[in-house]
Amino acid sequence: MNQVDYLRISLIDRCNFRCQYCMPEGVELDYILKQQLLTNEELLTLIREVFIPVGFNRFRLTGGEPLLRPRVVDLVSAIATLPQTQDLSMTTNGFLLAPMAQNLYNAGLRRINISLDSLDADTFDQIIGNQGRSRWQQVWHGIQAAHSVGFDPLKLNVVVIPGVNDHEILDLAALTIDKQWHVRFIEFMPIGNVDLFGDRGWVSSAELRQQIRDRWGLTESQVRGAGPADVFKIPGAKGTLGFISQMSECFCDRCNRMRLSADGWLRPCLLNETGQIDLKTALRSGTSTAQLQEQVRHLLRMKPEINFKGRDSGIVGTYTRTMSQIGG
């Protein structure tokens, strides 16, 4: 198993979208109250005095939608300037990004992933649960702003939903030809909206790669990320194509991450809540950071056994939160 040195940090569970694959349709979510969220000071204490000492040095800020977090630019700056931070990135839906991109870059953020599940405005609005004025154009402006500012790599995340956006695979892949953008196709998975998954199912990465291979050809890329994506390239393209195959190919043995929820729960596996630790309550009750370090070390030792490997047998993992509440 890889060294676990990568922490995904959910800054907030609220989101200004309601994506089909992330939140169950028609279900009211119990959002975390403000006083239950980790404060910036608590989060920085945990990063400096717990996570870094046990070996974490790469951090990704997620949500909900992380740009809804008050003082998010200040938080980015504080994490980026820690001498032990080797990598700081963010995943966003891009809706609020355009006016914030330069400030985020100036604060030290260099890598960004933006969700772009469709190039068609109507399909996009259907996926994000938008009922009013289309939000596609504002997200596209956010992507263009991130590109202009200099974020590199700039990655576009696509969750492939059968019968909804799977007909756009070639159009989305073509974005990598003329720009140094990295499009990542993510297999739809049964967390966040189990009913939709049951209705729609999923398309394997192998099928997507074959579509692209038949159109342009496809080669393995020399660019290799630190995450679970298998990276390929259209011959002659400036960017790359990543395939995250959590349904068709179990990559538990290469998992290098844990997840910290906005209310302070440290979770060892996306698909399994077993073993998770309530760091916020412990910190607020006076538990020393040395004791918290030991708890995290124990969870790190347990992680290979906790990583969920039951998909092949059709077993569903143990989880009670939606994808938006976990942070993806």
Curated annotation (Swiss-Prot):
Positions bound to S-adenosyl-L-methionine: Y21, G64, S115, M189
Q: Which UniProt keywords apply?
A: 4Fe-4S, GTP-binding, Iron, Iron-sulfur, Lyase, Metal-binding, Molybdenum cofactor biosynthesis, Nucleotide-binding, S-adenosyl-L-methionine
Q: What class of enzyme is it?
A: lyase
Q: Which SMART domains match?
A: Elp3 (SM00729)
Catalyzed reactions: GTP + AH2 + S-adenosyl-L-methionine = (8S)-3',8-cyclo-7,8-dihydroguanosine 5'-triphosphate + 5'-deoxyadenosine + L-methionine + A + H(+)
Its pathway is: Cofactor biosynthesis; molybdopterin biosynthesis
Give me the residues that bind [4Fe-4S] cluster 2, please: C252, C255, C269
Q: Which residues bind GTP?
A: R8, R60, T91, K155, R257, M258, R259
Cofactors needed by this protein, per the record, are:
[4Fe-4S] cluster
Please give the biological process terms from Gene Ontology that the record holds: Mo-molybdopterin cofactor biosynthetic process
List the EC numbers from the record. Answer: 4.1.99.22
According to the record, cofactor stoichiometry and binding are noted as: Binds 2 [4Fe-4S] clusters. Binds 1 [4Fe-4S] cluster coordinated with 3 cysteines and an exchangeable S-adenosyl-L-methionine and 1 [4Fe-4S] cluster coordinated with 3 cysteines and the GTP-derived substrate.
| Protein family membership | Belongs to the radical SAM superfamily. MoaA family.
The UniProt function text for this chain reads: Catalyzes the cyclization of GTP to (8S)-3',8-cyclo-7,8-dihydroguanosine 5'-triphosphate.
Assembly description: Monomer and homodimer.
Q: What is this protein called?
A: GTP 3',8-cyclase
Q: Which organism is it from?
A: Nostoc punctiforme (strain ATCC 29133 / PCC 73102)
- Origin organism lineage: Bacteria, Bacillati, Cyanobacteriota, Cyanophyceae, Nostocales
